[in-house]
């Protein structure tokens, strides 16, 4: 696709999608297309999770979630019927950080702690999905 087509498509998405309602941007669609380059990196799990959560927020009265520190906890929560998983900053600070230390709940733990926790949770959910689709 050309940069012009990409910018036109992005502009239409911003105008038509309820996801972007009320957002004011100090930049143009052309600037976004120019800065992001020609290769679109796809983060499938993040996109699917964000789309599902957005849909839940707009269709469910309440979206119940419990904190999960491990992949197994996340799998059990989903198997129990929860539709969302919460990654608690307090849990990361207290016991789930990559330094293996205990920190106060002030985001003082190593910066890679939450991404590593999410990676473990995603890996467990992916493996469970693979097992159930064999």
Q: Language-model segments: which ranges?
A:
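Conserved, mostly hydrophobic/aromatic
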Residues: 14, 77
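Mature N-terminal, pre-catalytic/accessory segment of carbohydrate-active enzymes
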Residues: 15-16, 26
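Glycine-rich, proline-tolerant flexible connector loops at the mouths of alpha/beta enzymes
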Residues: 41, 84-115, 131-134
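Active-site mouth loops of central-metabolism enzymes
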Residues: 56-73, 105-108
């Amino acid at each position: 696709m050309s940069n012009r087509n990409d910018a036109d498509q992005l502009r239409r998405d911003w105008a038509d999608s309820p996801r972007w309602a009320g957002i004011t941007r100090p930049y143009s669609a052309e600037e976004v297309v120019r800065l992001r380059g020609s290769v679109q990196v796809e983060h499938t799990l993040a996109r699917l999770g964000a789309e599902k959560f957005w849909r839940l927020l707009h269709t469910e009265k309440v979206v119940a979630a419990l904190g999960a520190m491990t992949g197994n906890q996340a799998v059990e929560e989903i198997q129990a019927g929860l539709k969302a998983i919460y990654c608690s900053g307090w849990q990361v600070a207290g016991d789930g950080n990559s330094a293996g230390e205990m920190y106060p709940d002030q985001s003082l733990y190593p910066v890679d702690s939450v991404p590593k926790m999410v990676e473990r949770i995603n890996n467990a959910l992916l493996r469970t999905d693979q097992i159930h689709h064999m």
